[in-house]
Structure formats: C-alpha cells, structure tokens
C-alpha cells in the first residue's frame, strides 16, 4: 500500500436516491482503480447483507480505499465512504458526510432529482463538501441529460456546466469521475501535530473479534499499540489491530490525519462504539469531542410476539444479538392478554422496522406476529406530571389525563405536477396542514405539509406511491409535539380486550375507524362454533359492533325421521354445550387481523 502524504488523499462519498445507481457506480470505481480484481467482482460489492442486495438499498455503511494514478503521474489515495440513501438512516448519512471533503451527486438522467437525494445534498452543503454532479444512466433511451442539468441547477443551485455524464452499467465516464475527484475534491486538513481525534462513522459486530469500528482520523495519528478513549461513552480500550479497507481489511501499523480505517479492540456491543463518537488517545486526550454526536432516538414502536410461546427465549436471544450490530434498535419485554409474552421494540422508521423484522425471521428462523406501529405520545396528567407513552394499550385513563400531544413532522413531497390534487387529497385525509407549494421546474412541484407522525408511519408511503404511479418521493423531519383531541380505541373480541389491536386515533375519525376495523376483523377472524361479538369502544362507550355468526353443526343428521322429543333433546344438549363453549372459548386472532389496523385507510375507513 502506498503511504500517501495528506495532500494526495481524497475522501469522498456518493449521494444518490434509491435506484439511481450508487452501488453500481461504486463497483465501477473499485474495478477501474484495480482495487477489486474483475474475477472477484460481484454486483453491489459494498452491500454485504443479502437483504441489501435484494431490496437494492444500502443499509449499513461501507468504506473502501483505492489507489489511483492521476493524469499528473502522481499516485493518489481515494477513500470512498458509502452512505445509505434512505430517510430512516439520515443520522448515519450525516456522520459519513462529516468524514468526507467531497461528494459525488449521482442523479438518474431519466428520472431527475428525488426527495432523499435533496435531503442528503443539504446535509453535504452544511458540512461544506465539494459536490460533483454526475448524470448516471445516460445509455438509457429515456435519458434527457440537458433537462436534468436544468433541474439540478434550479432545485439545488449547483452549477452543472461541468457535470459528468456517465453510465455505471457500461463503465462510460468512470475515468473522468476519478480524475474529477482528484482535481475538485480538496485534500484533508493537514493536522498531524494536533491532538488525536477520529470520528466513528460506522461499526458492525463480528462474532469472533467483537465490534469492528470504521473511523476517519481528523487530526493526529493512531497506532496499533495505542490505548484509546471513546469520548461520548467514556470507555477505554486497548487496540488489537488497526487497518484499512481495500475493500477487504488489511492491517497497518499507523494511520494519520486524513486517513480512513478500521479498528478492533474486543468491544462487546455496537452501543459502546456509537456512530458519531470521537476516538482519542488515553495518554493524551483531546480537549473536546468532534461536534454533532447525538444518540439515535426511536420514532416508531411496535410489539413483536412469537407465534409459538416456546420461541420467546429464542426471540430474546435474537434481539440481543441484533442489537449488538444495530445500536438504534431498542426493546423491552411486554405481555399481552391476547398474544402472551413478547417485546415492545423501537425503530428509527418504518423501513428500519421492516428490515429488523425480516432479519429476525430470516437470520434467526423465527415466526413473528407484529402489531401495528405506533409513535411516542406525550400525555399531560392532571397532577402536572408528563408521561411518555409508546404503547397505545398503556395510555392513562381519561379521568387522570388533561391532554395528549403527538409528534408532528414537516413533510416535503416532490412529484410531477399532474399528481398535485391526488397528493393534496392524501395529506388532507391524514390531518395534514398545508404550508407551501413551490414549482421547481414547469412540470415538477414541491408540496410542503405538516402532518402528525402517526399518520405517516402506517401506510402513507405506499399510498403516496400508489396515487402517483410511483413518481412522487418524500422526505420528512420532526418539528415537535402538538396537542390534539386524541382518544384510545379499544377492540373487544368475545368481550375481551385485545390489547394488541388498541390504537390511538383522532376523536373526529374514531367512529369511522372503529366501524371499518370491526368490519375488517369480521372478515379475517375464522368462524367458531359459537357466536363471536366484535366491538370497538372508547372508554366504556361502544361505538361500533358486529358479530361473527356461529358455524352450525347438524346434530340431527343421524336422526332419520323418528321421535321429535329425541331431536329436541339433542338440540338442547347442543345449545348447552355452545353456552359453555362461549364462556370458556378463546378466539385465535390471525396475524392478518393485526395488520388490518394498518390497511384501514385503503378501504376508505378513515
């Protein structure tokens, strides 16, 4: 490996919306610089999880070091730091941008700028990164690079005269991109003599070596013999090894300011080496940590229950192991009268929730029932105290509480303007408050709304895509809590409260939601040999009810003609048995019923 001086190091990342070709471009850069031999190449080389490849998204960050000989004959070290493009993982993105001096903005030459790209570009501009626009997929028949250049200039305000046209699929334009990184991205600050500070921009759990931490040295130097201090968690470690990603790990003795590498120090859990934390030397610690560290706060909560009660310990072990590699996942045990033992889990967003659920089912072979997602409500009690509620079933009684506040988000939706009406209708249905509308170009519009987060976490994204035939994209950020007239809607099945089906809804919507929910459950719960009443209630008031009629078992089938009193006796015996069955009978609620709470908005229920 070449030990390049700071002036010949370039740290950059790639910003792109899902599907705009970021991982493919990263593959080409690795191939063109000879970092990965052609025979070892596989698509989406830096996306290590099968789940990432299948969904075509980047979840965990990766990094790769490339050696590149520029047109001036000098050899440069290019560190590519891969970033996730999804809104749920925006904190990880902001940390990886802090580790760079430049960014390639990859825009699909046929689709144009999308919402999440924009959010990440603004983060990049906040971090003073040099942004190089790249128009990808110009080999597609629908590509229109000139229109997209205008769009980028209009929306982001970037000068696109020297935007690089490329096709990551065929490799066209890739050498120009590498040269542009050398020419236009500034080298890191020469801070070798300052106290050592390194930024953690990612970490993952290795079952044999503990947590492997990816970091960028901001100032000073780190050698493999050092003892280090993590400034936010206040933990100290003796280093086992440090090295570089090329893209496979290679040990080195020392890394200095400007370089990107990894370290292993027998760290037990990812939570001990949080993204955004600062590494410094124990012998000569820095005075203050690097700015911008915050702990990931879960936004969306749901209950996870095993379908078989004896799988509960397996689920607990699986969550323990998953938390080692996913510090944003929070969970605590929960019991439910309908479902038995399980866990209440907190996630960054809906995508994060789906991914965790899928990883639990796939990697740990579990069969799970997932309750409808909810958000954290702030309940102001009559005695002046404040209670945070993440499980609708635990909402305090109306007599004890004064008001309920729910989290609101500022939502920006980008779409072609013919879908304007459909999107405004959707936001209105979801209790959205109209803020602004801007025309970006003659045929694309930005809608800005403020909405309750609870209305977004169910199926807002799916509905938005459905109503715009997949053309709209959205981006949201939290703006705080607001008071609303909210009530707890309980569902009673056969007289018993099914706590896993409890939701918190707006008072004006309660009747419609309750009515739609009981009707939906009627379709989904299998018939029994006794009548099952299904009711929706607010407090002690039943607002909607229906019932599933019993299956009639013909006890008279064996009586051919004969005495009427014999038949009466059999029918009486059956009625008695049904009465006992109704009193004792437990109704099994299938998984689809719990998801019914989510799908209500499709059927026009709310």
Curated annotation (Swiss-Prot):
One of its GO terms (biological process) is translation. It is an enzyme of class 3 (hydrolase). Its EC number is 3.6.5.n1. GO terms for cellular component: plasma membrane. It is a peripheral membrane protein. Residues 7-189 form the tr-type G domain. InterPro entries: EF-4, EFG_III/V, EFG_V-like, EFTu-like_2, G_TR_CS, GUFP, LepA_C_sf, LepA_CTD. GTP binds at residues 19-24, 136-139. It is found in: Cell inner membrane. SUPFAM superfamilies: EF-G C-terminal domain-like, P-loop containing nucleoside triphosphate hydrolases, Translation proteins. It catalyses: GTP + H2O = GDP + phosphate + H(+). Keywords: Cell inner membrane, Cell membrane, GTP-binding, Hydrolase, Membrane, Nucleotide-binding, Protein biosynthesis. One of its GO terms (molecular function) is GTP binding. NCBIfam families: lepA, small_GTP. Required for accurate and efficient protein synthesis under certain stress conditions. May act as a fidelity factor of the translation reaction, by catalyzing a one-codon backward translocation of tRNAs on improperly translocated ribosomes. Back-translocation proceeds from a post-translocation (POST) complex to a pre-translocation (PRE) complex, thus giving elongation factor G a second chance to translocate the tRNAs correctly. Binds to ribosomes in a GTP-dependent manner. Belongs to the TRAFAC class translation factor GTPase superfamily. Classic translation factor GTPase family. LepA subfamily. This is Elongation factor 4. It comes from Parasynechococcus marenigrum (strain WH8102).
């Amino acid at each position: 490996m070449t030990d390049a001086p700071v002036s010949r190091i370039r740290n950059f990342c790639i910003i792109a919306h899902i599907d705009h070709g970021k991982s493919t471009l990263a593959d080409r850069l690795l191939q063109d610089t000879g970092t990965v031999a052609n025979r070892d190449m596989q698509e989406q080389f830096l996306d290590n999880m099968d789940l990432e490849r299948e969904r075509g998204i980047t979840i965990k960050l990766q990094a790769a070091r490339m050696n590149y000989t520029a047109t001036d004959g000098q050899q440069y070290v290019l560190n590519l730091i891969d970033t996730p493009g999804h809104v749920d993982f925006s904190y990880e993105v902001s940390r990886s941008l802090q580790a760079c001096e430049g960014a390639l903005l990859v825009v699909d030459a046929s689709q144009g700028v999308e919402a999440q790209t924009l959010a990440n570009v603004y983060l990049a501009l906040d971090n003073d990164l040099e942004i190089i626009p790249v128009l990808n997929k110009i080999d597609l028949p629908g590509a229109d690079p000139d229109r997209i250049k205008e769009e980028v200039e209009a929306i982001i305000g970037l000068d696109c005269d020297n935007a690089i046209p490329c096709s990551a699929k065929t490799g066209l334009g890739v050498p120009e991109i590498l040269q542009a990184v050398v020419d236009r991205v500034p080298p890191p600050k020469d801070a070798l003599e300052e106290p050592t500070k390194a930024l953690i921009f990612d970490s993952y759990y290795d079952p044999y070596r503990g947590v492997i931490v990816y970091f960028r040295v901001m100032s000073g130097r780190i050698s493999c013999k050092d003892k280090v201090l993590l400034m936010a968690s206040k933990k100290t470690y003796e280093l086992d090894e440090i090295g570089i990603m090329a893209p496979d790990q290679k040990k080195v003795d020392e890394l200095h300011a400007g370089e990107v590498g990894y370290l292993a120090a027998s760290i037990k859990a990812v939570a001990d080496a949080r993204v955004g934390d600062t590494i410094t030397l124990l012998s000569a610690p820095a005075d203050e940590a690097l700015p911008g560290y915050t702990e990931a706060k879960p936004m969306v909560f749901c209950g996870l229950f095993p379908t078989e009660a004896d799988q509960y310990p397996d689920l607990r072990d699986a969550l323990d192991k998953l938390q080692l590699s996913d510090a944003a996942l929070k969970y605590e045990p929960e019991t439910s009268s309908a479902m038995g033992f399980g866990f209440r889990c907190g996630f960054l967003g809906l995508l994060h929730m789906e991914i965790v659920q899928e990883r639990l089912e796939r990697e740990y072979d579990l069969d799970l029932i997932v309750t409808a997602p909810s958000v954290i409500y702030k309940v102001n009690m009559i005695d002046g105290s404040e209670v945070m509620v993440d499980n609708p079933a635990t909402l305090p009684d109306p007599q004890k509480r004064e008001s309920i506040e729910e989290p609101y988000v500022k939502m920006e939706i980008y779409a072609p303007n013919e879908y304007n009406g459909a999107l405004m209708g959707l936001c209105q249905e979801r209790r959205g408050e109209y803020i602004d509308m801007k025309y970006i170009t003659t045929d694309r519009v930005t809608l800005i709304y403020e909405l309750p987060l609870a209305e977004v976490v169910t199926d807002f994204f799916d509905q938005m895509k459905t109503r715009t035939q997949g053309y709209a994209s959205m981006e949201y950020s939290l703006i705080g809590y607001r008071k609303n007239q909210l009530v707890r809607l309980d569902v009673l099945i056969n007289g018993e409260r099914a706590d896993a089906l409890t939701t918190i809804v707006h008072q004006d919507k309660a009747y419609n939601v309750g009515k739609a929910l009981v009707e939906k459950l009627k379709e989904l719960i299998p018939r029994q040999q006794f009548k099952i009443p299904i009711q929706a209630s607010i407090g002690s008031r039943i607002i909607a009810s229906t019932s599933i009629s019993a299956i009639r078992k013909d006890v008279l089938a064996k009586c051919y003609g004969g005495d009427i009193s014999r038949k009466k006796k059999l029918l009486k015996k059956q009625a008695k048995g049904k009465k006992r069955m109704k009193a004792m009978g437990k109704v099994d609620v299938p998984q689809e019923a719990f998801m019914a709470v989510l799908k209500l908005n499709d059927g026009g229920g709310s």
